[in-house]
Amino acid sequence: MNRICQVVGRLVWLMALPLALPLSLAQAAPVGDALNTPAMLAPQARHAVLLDLAHAGARLVAVGERGIVLLSDDNGMSWRQAVVPVSVSLTAVQFTDANTGWAVGHAGVVLASHDGGEHWNVQLDGVRAAQLELQTARQQLPTATDQDAAAARVQTAERFVDEGPDKPFLALKFIDDKHGLIVGAYGLAFQTEDGGRTWHSLIGQIDNPMGAHLYAIARQGEHWFIAGEQGYLARSDDAGQSFTSLESPYAGSFFALQTRDDGRLLAAGLKGNAFVSNDLGESFEAAPVPMPISFSDAIRTDDGQLLLVNQAGALFRTSNQPGALLKPYGPPLGMPVASVIQAADGTLVLAGFTGLARVSAPIATASE
């Protein structure tokens, strides 16, 4: 079984329908064709599998299967489809202002938009990403302190080149319109300092010797955090230039990672496991919830609290009350949810296996 079959199988098991279906859909047509085929305009696109949401100023942007990008200028009440040059599934999206944004996805694709998501251009794909990693691994081999590890990295990079663009990017984090980090399957990690015009591999600067899949990125000032499979957690103390692994509070995978203004870090993943750290990930406290269903996303709400959503559509928010790190927020929504965002009017917009939905439930006060 080749490497992409393995990652598809593992992600299907780990992420269930919201992320697993796009992985299978991505294999329905040759990857090269999908990289060169624009996303089809679909009248019912808002009911497609959608995996992530972002703000572009007052606009909302949703991304998902087969290159679908949807835009809303009325807090998620209506949506229209954008023009996208690829038809691979898109897994994550972020904008740094009303115009400038990026989306990442299958086949190692990175897209950029400079008009609020109306149009997109390809900045990187899996072919070029593999070549960049191989070039970097070879350049760093002669001066590496651990020659065995460096040689193994070169061999892995050569295999990535041979296998082609079959590995997805799964998360991204930009701090402005120039500086950003993207991560994905098999420890893929690339960084840009010029808005994506050029990218360089960061794989060698991340303490991830087993090549764990990386699912989420968060930032707290100069400190950056990455979370992934099998309990993988890492922190950067140099503004994202290098990462050191942290001692994990459990061995399951993390899919959601978020920080609060007061420095609290929340990591959540399989079977309802959630943990809170108040010391930059040096130690964690379990945050029990009443249902063993995997978490899929975490956001910071307008009142500064953190909101978690699981794959059954149940919502939980951080609490300032002692002994209750997470509190249920309303009844379960009854839909598999991959991503959640707070619209400008205070309502929640959710994306998932059945498309998009709005929840008219204003966020409660931070004192609760």
Question: Where are the regions a protein language model picked out?
Answer:
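N-terminal secretory signal peptides that target proteins for export/translocation
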Residues: 1-7
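Bacterial N-terminal signal peptides
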Residues: 11-24
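Residue-level hotspots at or immediately adjacent to binding/recognition sites across diverse folds
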Residues: 27-368
